[in-house]
Every structure is written in structure tokens, then in C-alpha cells.
Amino acid sequence: MALQMIAPFLSSFLPNPRHSLAAHGLTHQKCVSKHISCSTTTPTYSTTVPRRSGNYKPSIWDYDFVQSLGSGYKVEAHGTRVKKLKEVVKHLLKETDSSLAQIELIDKLRRLGLRWLFKNEIKQVLYTISSDNTSIEMRKDLHAVSTRFRLLRQHGYKVSTDVFNDFKDEKGCFKPSLSMDIKGMLSLYEASHLAFQGETVLDEARAFVSTHLMDIKENIDPILHKKVEHALDMPLHWRLEKLEARWYMDIYMREEGMNSSLLELAMLHFNIVQTTFQTNLKSLSRWWKDLGLGEQLSFTRDRLVECFFWAAAMTPEPQFGRCQEVVAKVAQLIIIIDDIYDVYGTVDELELFTNAIDRWDLEAMEQLPEYMKTCFLALYNSINEIGYDILKEEGRNVIPYLRNTWTELCKAFLVEAKWYSSGYTPTLEEYLQTSWISIGSLPMQTYVFALLGKNLAPESSDFAEKISDILRLGGMMIRLPDDLGTSTDELKRGDVPKSIQCYMHEAGVTEDVARDHIMGLFQETWKKLNEYLVESSLPHAFIDHAMNLGRVSYCTYKHGDGFSDGFGDPGSQEKKMFMSLFAEPLQVDEAKGISFYVDGGSA
């Protein structure tokens, strides 16, 4: 179904002669001539048809608040200092001769959010380390072996799990004496989350160290205690890069051997990127206000700020600001349409809307009720406008493929609406075949590939097949945590049974057992993506974006429905996350330390 349309879309990434706009029948005028602003008219939906309500909370992030964001940390003001500090760190990387010291420095750079500044240097060091036959002493250091294993796998190197054999006894079990090496066990725990499917040794390692770390975490020094608690709450491999950087800077400044230049660079870089995020979010907020769709369709969720949080998590690199804005727009439009299918529209109306999206012409729009016309036209203009920009700049007409992702999404929404209307409970397999699409990742990932496609040209003949699987896995990375966090609330609102309920119905098990099963599927999805990162010829960026969807989804839904409700709850972890990333700059003052806002257990 959805994957059948991916191959021709991906072929547009291949180098081709630059086409004229006229050759595609597209000019800017034709592409956006129906552009609308909805803010000056009254609501356009019928009040005569009985409608359900999602009882969604309003957004707390009003326009004036977003427009007031600003920290003053710009490259122009701090660029000279950043450049000097970068040279200091480059020298540090070059002069560090111990393999363990190099590994630990690279790990610090990643955790401090600096890997993008030293991409080439890190690549060179890891290449050397990957071919280094480490000393006997280092091979017997659990921390060194585990950290090396994790970093190399994170960067796409093949590393065998045989490196952990030295830490097993004659029965093939991890030696009980390892429980005395807390630092080593913590590193092994983090490494175990880079497992592939079938690597039981890493599953055994995770179970072994988890038990011991839980038992001893109260009887260790405060900094190590924070690290253990942080890891057990969520492994490093599953964490969002910027949130981890915010948390780790507070830890690093208290560590023995802290390098002040490294810490200062991390803080300055964080603040400069935060300023870039603020600029992009302000632009996005102006677009949303001008569009006026939230006021017109007041039964839907206004989650623009949350959408930008997701977009920035999916493509955290600061140079991808345009991509972040576009993905945030797409995500907010997905929410609007999702609320129409889930809560507001009748089945007959939804069939008309799905048909209009499939036909993709303004004549089809005329059959829709007024509230759907508003939504259709906003979507129509947005897709054409983005497609026009890509065609103008790169000579690739991606509009047919962008359209197709929305068609597949709406068809999946319609299937679920009919399930709900008829009271049907699908099998888990049947549910997942539809719900990985209905979660909305397909348009988001496709837009990312379209915007970054010129930098991600395929190199293998089986590219289309592999990327199709990445798209599906990306959808699963959102769907499974979403169901774990939101299914109770969504069933109360009136929604199709989620994966938990489908498995309970199919297998005749309790909710706790079903939740464990769905969490197991999430872990297996991670393992598949881990293997793609190492074994696949695909550009790592494709796989990273799918992994980032899992990271932001798990972060958002770990403690409930953090997307629909949590960002608006005073004191919620989700609100704290937003404020720490987008609103509150770090105080770059060694004498005072860092102003710390994110709780160590949730970042």
C-alpha cells in the first residue's frame, strides 16, 4: 500500500538535469494562487450534525509569548570565542594518545551536544580506534570495552559481541564480581541498547546490570548515583540529544578532570542553537497566526509549539532550520486532520474528504462540507508551496510524492474511523499494518527526505526497498510509545482500540501483560534500526531520523499523553523540557556554574 509509492519518489533524489518550472506545469502563481488566510471569517462547520468532542486543552503558548523569546546569543556576538574554543578542543582530540582517553573524550563531545562541530575529527579518531588491537589491559576493562563498542556501533562500525566474552565465567554467564565495578556496569548497560536482533548476550547483559544497578544505586557517591538513576530511567541511546546535553552539562561541571574550555564551548553552542530555534519558532508562529486554521477549526488541537519540539528533535542539526519549520507545519496539519477523522467528522464526510485528497483537485473540494473545505485548501496550498520551493531550488518535482503520503495517511485514518464506527477490534497485526501509517510519520519523514534529498543520494540498487522499511520502522517508533502513553485517554474520548487492547482481545491477557508485549515490540524495533545503522548501505541520516522519531516519542509519552495534555500542565516535565531547550539560556559563568532546569530523571 503505502510502500508501493516510495520507489518513484526516491528516484527523484538521483542526480538529474535541472528542469524548468514550466516543464512541470508549475509556477509560483499557479502553485499557490488559492492561498488562504482563515483568520477573518467565522467558523465554517455545521452545528446541525451531532459531533463528538475530544475535550482537548488549549495551547498555553500564545503568539505574544513565542514572539517574545530571545536570548541574545548569536554567532555574530560569540563567534570569535567559539572559534577559539573549537581550536582548543581540536588540539585536545589530536594530542590525546590513549585509546581510552580518546573514547571518553568523544563520548563527552556527544553527550555535550558538540558532535556536529567535530564530525570529521571524531570520524578520523573512530576509524583509527576501530582497527586498533587494544591492549590486554584495556580488553579487560569493562568500561573501556563497553564504551568503545557503543560508540563504534553508533557510528556504523561492525563490532562483534565477542568482545564481552572476557567478562563471562565458564558457564557463559557474566561474572558476579563485575557487580563491584559500577562504572563498568553502567557502561555495559548503555552498550546493551545497541543490540541487534538475536544478540542474546546483550539482552543478558542488560538484565544482569539492571538488577545490580538497582540494588546498589543508593550506596554510591552522588554524581555516580545521578548517572545510574538517569540511565535506568532511560538509556542514553534512546535520549534526545539536546535534552541530554542540557542534563549532562550540570553533571560534567562536577566531574573530576572537567575541562573548562570544553564546558564553555558546550554552553555557548547550546545558547547559539537555542537562538536559532527561537528564530525558527517565531517564523512558524507567524505562519500559524496568518493561516488562522486553529480559530476556524476550534475543535482541533493547537499544538504548534509541541510540533516544533518534535521537528527539532527529528532533525536537531542547526543547519536544518528550514527543514524543522516545514516538518513542524506538516505535523500541525496532521493533527488537524487527525482530529477531524478521530473526533469530529462523520464516516460519510470522511469518505468524501479522503476522495478529495486522493483526487487532489479543487473541484473535488466543492463536494466537502465547509469546515473540510477550509482544511483541504490549507493542506493543498502548503504542499504545493513547499513543492514549488524544492522544484525552484533543486529542479525536482516532489509534489506527486508528497501528495501520495497524505493520501495514504487519510486512507489509514478512514480505516480506523470505520473500525470505531462499527465497533470492530482488529488483530494486533492488522492494527499495526494500518496504524504505523495513521500515526503520521510517513508525511514527516517524506518531507525530510524531500528537503534533504540532494545530500542523501542513494548508492545501492536496493535503496528503495531498504528505505521503505526505514519508513515503516519510523512509524512503529512513534506508534508503540504513543499507544503505551495515550491509549487509556483516547479510549475515554472514543477511539479505535490501540495495540494494547488489540493484543488483550486477541491473546486473552491482562493489560499489564499486553503492555509488556508492546514494549517488547518497541525494543525489537530499536534492534532492527541498530542493525540498519551498521549493516545497511543507506546514508546514516535516513536511519538517524527514524531513530529520532523513537526518541522524541518515548520522551513525550513515557509518563502519559505528554503531547495532547502534558505541555500545557503547569510543572509538567514536558513544559520544563520546552523551556530548557527554547526559552532559558545557560549562564556562561564559571564562577556561578550552570542554571539547571531539567530534572535528571526525565531529560
From Swiss-Prot:
Binds 3 Mg(2+) or Mn(2+) ions per subunit. Keywords: Chloroplast, Hydrolase, Magnesium, Manganese, Metal-binding, Plastid, Transit peptide. (2E)-geranyl diphosphate binds at residues 301, 338, 342, 479, 482. Disulfide bonds: none annotated. Expressed in the oil cells of the leaves. A motif (DDXXD motif) lies at residues 338-342. Mg(2+) 2 binds at residues 338, 342. It is an enzyme of class 3 (hydrolase). Optimum pH is 7. Pathway: Secondary metabolite biosynthesis; terpenoid biosynthesis. Mg(2+) 3 binds at residues 482, 486, 490. It comes from the Eukaryota. It is found in: Plastid, Chloroplast. Mg(2+) 1 binds at residues 338, 342. Its cofactor is Mg(2+); Mn(2+). The Asp-Asp-Xaa-Xaa-Asp/Glu (DDXXD/E) motif is important for the catalytic activity, presumably through binding to Mg(2+). Exclusively observed in the geraniol chemotype of this organism. Monoterpene synthase that catalyzes the formation of geraniol from geranyl diphosphate. This is Geraniol synthase, chloroplastic. The lineage of its organism: Eukaryota, Viridiplantae, Streptophyta, Embryophyta, Tracheophyta. The gene is GerS.
